[in-house]
Amino acid sequence: MRKIEYGGELFDMSSNRPFTGADQKLIPSDWQLYRSGRDALRAFARLADRKRILMPALCCSSMVLPFRQSGWEVAFYRLKPDLSADETDVSGKLRNDDVLLYMRYFGIRPFSDAFLESLRSSGRSILFLEDRTHDIWAERFDSGFRPDAVAASLRKWAALPEGGMLRTDLGTYPAETDTRYGDLRREAMEEKSCYLETGDERLNLDAREKYSHAEQLLNISAKPIRMASQYETLLCGLDFTAILEARRRNLRRLIEKLAPLIEDGIVHLMTGTPENSGLYLPILIDNRDSVQRELIRRRLYCPAAIWPEPPEASGVCSVSHYVTEHMLSVLCDQRYNETDMDYLADNLIDILKTGGNPA
């Protein structure tokens, strides 16, 4: 039976793929668990005790905010068309005692290990922070450069009311818990699930209000908040290997369905190996805004650029600006199966053939 809608916030806790056998893998013991990825960055900012960070122009305001709240200066570096970093630009903008933040966009390596090692051995006292939100659960085969800290948002991967992680040798921040944010999100998730079962629009509207209120709480909180124990228990009970396998299966089906448009140049894959991440199928298309509007009209909610360009980064990088204007993140998460992917892809193909205009 066709669903009322597709996409949006991960809310269906029944799709979280709990462990079914005795082989439960525990969350790594060196992970510090926080309410959100933003809280993990806030904790890092306090532990690092620096004053300036250099991050890619292709990022979102939620990555900038924790450092601004901590009184840091935030600067941005350019990216190349393949989403690797412009190492010349980075070298020219880095200052002594800076923090260099980098991330693997859907599994794409931003720097060579040799470049990072050269910065570490330069005597400039640079700290390295890797954001692994896009590939936190994917197996990594490189065992080279080890950053000073790794952070990630876990809420993008499963229906988790709370979820952020930090791994670092800089110490442990003594964060307190505050369940208001997670409890609001949990209530919103439950109402969203009921809405999809009953079609009661009042439940949907109330869920939206609670998500919005929770987001406001997260943004105004300047201090790091630790993950509450009940949500840590939920996180530790999830089989992320199964979740990643489900996402990759859906990715393969989407690529198979979209292959003719990819061959014709109507759809451009942002990476040739999206399975290295599994977060979304990231594509670049013309008329992205009109295509997305028509998807929404059909109740198919695929995010646009998942990093709306921060105002502070405007004009820094033409690649970042292009991606922000043309990217569509096609959902592939574990709530759905291959039949759902067929429905989503068929609608996307139909819309693209009309240039994003309603059929």
Indicate where each model-derived feature is located.
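Short hydrophobic/aromatic-enriched beta-strand-loop microsegments
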Residues: 73-78, 150-152, 302-306
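Conserved donor sugar-nucleotide recognition element shared by glycan-biosynthetic enzymes
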Residues: 33, 37
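Short, solvent-exposed loop/turn segments at secondary-structure junctions
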Residues: 38-40, 59-61, 82, 105-108, ...
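PLP-dependent aminotransferase-like
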Residues: 10-31, 42-125, 129, 136-137
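Conserved active-site segment immediately N-terminal to the catalytic lysine
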Residues: 129-167
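PLP-dependent aminotransferase class I/II
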Residues: 10, 21-22, 28, 32, ...
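Active-site-proximal region of nucleotide-activated glycan assembly enzymes
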Residues: 154-155, 161-186
